[in-house]
């Protein structure tokens, strides 16, 4: 199991805001996508980002991950403003986009080992198996990903979260293509992450159970819980 990093919580009690967005704005083609985004997340906290298609949910996550630059505003981590390519910040986050980001010619085992190497870690056969088991997909670890269903591929992508500890999860529609049993596996993984002092910012079209703050983009409208 991944080992939580230190300095974010004490005996499971949050020590104050760790991630903060300050008046964030993002534009595409000269047109504003969102403006005036302010929020903070402490250890054990989760923000659910909701809104209609085109409201900027995915763009916000990509700004937070450093893949896009904001038009204005700032992101701070542990009280320090995050600069482009900040290694300390990037090594503290895990990003799972709406697309799975998987080379389908690899097996699930090969994909997770490669993902671990990118973080400077060596994944053993057992750590990969355990990570896949957390998402209920360990039996397919040596099967080419191209032969898996969309739901199975999504679970392989999410298994990266169980393989390598990262304090901040940035997740774009994590439940896409998941059945109820697989969604329950993800909820258990998320709950454990938050109990261990982790944080998450999750873009979703359907509110996840378990609470947390809700950040509405693109105007108010009601969303049913998952």
UniProtKB/Swiss-Prot annotation:
EC number: 7.6.2.5
Binding site for ATP: 51-58
Cellular compartment(s): Cell inner membrane
Protein biosynthesis is among the record's keywords: no
GO cellular component: plasma membrane
Purpose of the protein: Part of the ABC transporter complex CcmAB involved in the biogenesis of c-type cytochromes; once thought to export heme, this seems not to be the case, but its exact role is uncertain. Responsible for energy coupling to the transport system.
Membrane topology: Peripheral membrane protein
Family that this chain belongs to: Belongs to the ABC transporter superfamily. CcmA exporter (TC 3.A.1.107) family.
GO terms of biological process kind: cytochrome complex assembly
Molecular function, one GO term: ATP hydrolysis activity
PANTHER family: ABC TRANSPORTER I FAMILY MEMBER 1
Subunit: The complex is composed of two ATP-binding proteins (CcmA) and two transmembrane proteins (CcmB).
Gene3D superfamilies: P-loop containing nucleotide triphosphate hydrolases
Lineage top rank: taxon: Bacteria
Domain annotation ABC transporter: ranges: 19-226
UniProt key word Cytoplasm: no
Keywords of this entry: ATP-binding, Cell inner membrane, Cell membrane, Cytochrome c-type biogenesis, Membrane, Nucleotide-binding, Translocase, Transport
InterPro entries attached to this UniProt entry: AAA+_ATPase, ABC_transporter-like_ATP-bd, ABC_transporter-like_CS, ABC_transptr_haem_export_CcmA, P-loop_NTPase
Recorded name of the encoding gene: ccmA
Stated name of the protein: Cytochrome c biogenesis ATP-binding export protein CcmA
Catalytically driven reaction(s): heme b(in) + ATP + H2O = heme b(out) + ADP + phosphate + H(+)
């Amino acid at each position: 199991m991944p080992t939580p990093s230190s300095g974010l919580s004490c005996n499971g009690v949050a020590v104050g805001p760790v991630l903060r967005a300050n008046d964030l704005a993002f534009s595409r083609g000269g047109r504003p996508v969102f403006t005036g985004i302010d929020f903070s997340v402490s250890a054990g906290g989760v923000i659910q980002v909701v809104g209609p298609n085109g409201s900027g949910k995915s763009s916000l996550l990509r700004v937070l991950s450093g893949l896009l630059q904001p038009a204005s505003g700032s992101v701070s981590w542990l009280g320090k403003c995050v600069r482009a390519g900040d290694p300390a910040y990037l090594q503290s986050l895990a990003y799972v986009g709406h697309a799975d980001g998987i080379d389908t010619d690899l097996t699930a085992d090969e994909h997770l080992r490669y993902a671990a190497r990118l973080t400077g870690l060596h994944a053993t056969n057992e750590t990969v198996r355990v990570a896949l088991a957390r998402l209920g997909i360990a039996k397919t670890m040596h099967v080419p990903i191209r032969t898996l269903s969309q739901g199975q591929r999504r679970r392989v992508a999410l298994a990266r979260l169980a393989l390598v500890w990262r304090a901040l999860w940035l997740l774009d529609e994590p439940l896409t293509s998941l059945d109820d049993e697989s969604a329950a596996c993800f909820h258990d993984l998320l709950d454990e992450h938050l109990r261990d002092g982790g944080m998450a910012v999750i873009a979703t079209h359907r509110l996840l159970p378990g609470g947390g703050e809700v950040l509405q983009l693109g105007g108010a409208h009601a969303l049913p819980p998952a």
